[in-house]
């Protein structure tokens, strides 16, 4: 329960900070709240009002995490090293190192998942630079793409490297440009 509160508090701060630095998004959020309040004017509509905001909040949190992490160095704990089998789908073998960034939580409430590209040996942990984000359009999770400092990959190579798992999801790739800008 305490972990859930901590995640909720972090997400609230991240959401609030993003709205403060993106006035167009803040305005969009205010318009959404007004529209929902007009549709659900009684106290009995409170649950529907809260639910109506959730997808917007999730999408803002995803954008905020992208803004926060793209181009940054992160410490990755690898829980599925290159060559290992998926814990549930044992026929799936990881062609890349896969892990998570401790204490950075994604929209699903779990620590942010990361594909580590450009490292051809299985590793247990790695400090890499986030070069891209895979936004799953039919799931609440995003997946981060990290690589060694100075190494980049074009979108088609990223797509090929993560296809073993991402083929099951509609997604788009947000890239860090070679100059380090989004």
Where are these regions (language model features)?
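Short, small-residue-biased leader/transition segments that mark boundaries at the very start
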Residues: 3-7
């Amino acid at each position: 329960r305490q972990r859930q509160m901590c995640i909720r508090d972090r997400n609230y701060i991240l959401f609030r900070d993003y709205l403060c630095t993106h006035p167009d998004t803040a305005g969009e959020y205010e318009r959404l709240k007004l529209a929902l309040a007009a549709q659900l004017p009684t106290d009995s509509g409170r649950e529907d009002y809260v639910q109506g905001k959730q997808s917007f909040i999730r999408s803002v949190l995803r954008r905020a995490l992208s803004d926060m992490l793209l181009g940054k160095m992160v410490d990755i704990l690898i829980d599925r090293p290159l060559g290992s089998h998926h814990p549930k789908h044992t026929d799936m073998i990881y062609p890349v190192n896969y892990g998570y960034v401790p204490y950075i939580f994604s929209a699903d409430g779990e620590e942010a998942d990361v594909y580590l590209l450009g490292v051809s040996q299985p590793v247990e942990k790695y400090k890499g630079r986030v070069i891209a984000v895979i936004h799953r359009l039919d799931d609440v999770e995003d997946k981060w793409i990290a690589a060694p400092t100075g190494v980049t990959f074009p979108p088609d190579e990223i797509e090929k490297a993560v296809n073993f798992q991402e083929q099951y999801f509609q997604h788009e790739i947000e890239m860090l440009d070679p100059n380090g800008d989004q």
